[in-house]
Each structure stands twice: as structure tokens, then as C-alpha cells.
């Protein structure tokens, strides 16, 4: 199966699971709480190489994944809806799509609230004040409330890469250095 087909399959699975979770959260009136729990889960995944391995590796059995996720749910006190959802995902051997599920859920929640989503890549974690300022600037440009998904990528060296819909603004130091390098090659 070509890589493009595989990523579309994973994306489709993630969207179906996210849609199911969103509908349950909507019925329970807990979209915000579920979103907060999913943000905590994403932070746990980003902060733990062991958890990343558990999620993506086919070496772990469904039972091992279920036990680990159950322990995680208990330790961090995730809500009943999110806790049960994580256990179902683990039982069905779909933990590898969990980051995609989280992203798809955020998109559904933002759409429900009339927000648009901006994917922001930064060399360093943004402070709360920086995130608020960025949201305000993006709202001024788009005219809509903006939910920001921040990804830290030290390889961009500095600056930001902001994607809103089909538009991308790249003010990263890496891109500026690449542009300068090309300009110097043309001169010399």
C-alpha cells in the first residue's frame, strides 16, 4: 500500500473516532472538558518517549496497551467519557491514531464554536501572553476567533510558522537563513 493511501486510511480512522467522541461530548455537554483532557493527553504523549512507543509500536499486545492506558487514566484522573474512550481505542488496537484523533476532535470543536484553527510551529514553547497576543493578531487578520495548536520544533531555530487554512506564514530563522544562503550563491 503506498504511503499516501496509508496516511489517508489513518486519517479516516482518526476522523471516525474523533467524530464519535465529539458526538458523545456534545450529548453530555462536555466538549470543553473533553478537549481539555485531550490536550493533557497530547502533552503526556509529547513528554514521554515510553508513551509514544506504547502508542505506535505493534510489539505491545492489546492487553498490554489496555493495562497501560487504564493505569494512565487512573493516575491522571481523566473524565469518565475520555477514560472510557481511551480504553476502547486501546482495546481496538487504534492507539497509533490517537494524535490524529486529538487533532480531528479539536477541529470539530473549533468548527462547532465558530472558530478557525491555526497550526503554529515554534522553536520554543510559547508563553501564555505570547499565545494570547498571537490569537489576537490572527483574529484581527481573519475576523474570527482562532484556536491555536502549538508544536515545538527546535530545528526552525527561531520565529514561527503559522498555518491557517490553506495560508502559511513562515517567519522561521531556518527559512530566512536558507533564503540568505540562496541569495549569496546567486551573487558569488
UniProtKB/Swiss-Prot annotation:
InterPro entries in the record: ATP_synth_OSCP/delta_N_sf, ATPase_OSCP/d_CS, ATPase_OSCP/dsu
PROSITE patterns found in the cross-reference section: ATPASE_DELTA
Role played: F(1)F(0) ATP synthase produces ATP from ADP in the presence of a proton or sodium gradient. F-type ATPases consist of two structural domains, F(1) containing the extramembraneous catalytic core and F(0) containing the membrane proton channel, linked together by a central stalk and a peripheral stalk. During catalysis, ATP synthesis in the catalytic domain of F(1) is coupled via a rotary mechanism of the central stalk subunits to proton translocation. This protein is part of the stalk that links CF(0) to CF(1). It either transmits conformational changes from CF(0) to CF(1) or is implicated in proton conduction.
This protein's name: ATP synthase subunit delta
Source superkingdom: Bacteria
Compartments where found: Cell inner membrane
Membership in a protein family: Belongs to the ATPase delta chain family.
Amino acid at each position: 500500500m503506498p504511503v499516501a493511501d496509508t496516511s489517508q486510511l489513518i486519517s479516516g480512522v482518526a476522523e471516525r473516532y474523533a467524530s464519535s467522541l465529539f458526538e458523545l461530548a456534545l450529548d453530555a455537554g462536555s466538549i470543553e472538558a473533553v478537549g481539555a483532557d485531550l490536550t493533557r493527553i497530547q502533552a503526556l504523549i509529547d513528554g514521554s518517549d515510553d508513551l509514544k512507543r506504547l502508542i505506535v509500536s505493534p510489539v505491545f499486545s492489546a492487553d498490554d496497551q489496555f493495562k497501560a492506558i487504564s493505569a494512565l487514566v487512573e493516575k491522571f484522573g481523566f473524565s469518565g467519557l475520555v477514560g472510557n474512550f481511551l480504553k476502547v481505542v486501546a482495546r481496538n488496537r487504534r492507539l497509533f491514531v490517537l494524535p490524529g484523533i486529538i487533532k480531528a476532535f479539536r477541529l470539530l470543536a473549533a468548527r462547532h464554536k465558530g472558530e478557525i484553527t491555526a497550526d503554529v510551529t515554534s522553536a520554543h514553547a510559547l508563553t501564555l501572553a505570547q499565545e494570547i497576543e498571537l490569537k489576537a493578531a490572527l483574529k484581527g487578520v481573519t475576523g474570527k476567533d482562532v484556536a491555536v495548536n502549538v508544536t515545538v520544533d527546535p530545528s526552525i531555530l527561531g520565529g514561527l510558522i503559522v498555518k491557517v487554512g490553506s495560508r502559511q506564514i513562515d517567519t522561521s530563522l531556518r527559512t530566512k537563513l536558507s533564503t540568505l544562503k540562496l541569495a549569496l550563491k546567486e551573487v558569488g
